[in-house]
Amino acid sequence: MTAESMLFNGAIVAIVLVLVGLAWGFLLLKIQGGEAE
């Protein structure tokens, strides 16, 4: 495994984690907002 492929995989993992985190946060906000109303 070369350094370039490790860097590439790391970038993909980071992007996926950010997207999942945003989706999860958005979901929690919608759920909390629904309960508050």
Swiss-Prot record:
Residues making up the signal peptide according to the UniProt record: none
- Record's subcellular location: Cellular thylakoid membrane
GO function term, MF aspect, one: electron transfer activity
The reply on keyword RNA-binding is: no
What keywords were assigned to this record?
A: Electron transport, Membrane, Photosynthesis, Thylakoid, Transmembrane, Transmembrane helix, Transport
A GO cellular-component term linked to this record: plasma membrane-derived thylakoid membrane
Keyword Cytoplasm listed: no
User: How does the protein's chain sit in the membrane according to the entry?
Assistant: Single-pass membrane protein
Chief location of this protein? membrane
What Pfam family does this protein match (any one)?
PetM
Q: Where are the transmembrane segments?
A: 11-29
Q: Which GO terms describe its biological process?
A: photosynthesis
Q: Which InterPro entries match?
A: PetM_cyt_b6/f_cplx_su7 (IPR012595)
Which superkingdom is the protein from? Bacteria
Q: How does it assemble?
A: The 4 large subunits of the cytochrome b6-f complex are cytochrome b6, subunit IV (17 kDa polypeptide, PetD), cytochrome f and the Rieske protein, while the 4 small subunits are PetG, PetL, PetM and PetN. The complex functions as a dimer.
Tell me the protein family, please.
Belongs to the PetM family.
Q: What does this protein do?
A: Component of the cytochrome b6-f complex, which mediates electron transfer between photosystem II (PSII) and photosystem I (PSI), cyclic electron flow around PSI, and state transitions.
**Protein's name according to its UniProt entry:** Cytochrome b6-f complex subunit 7
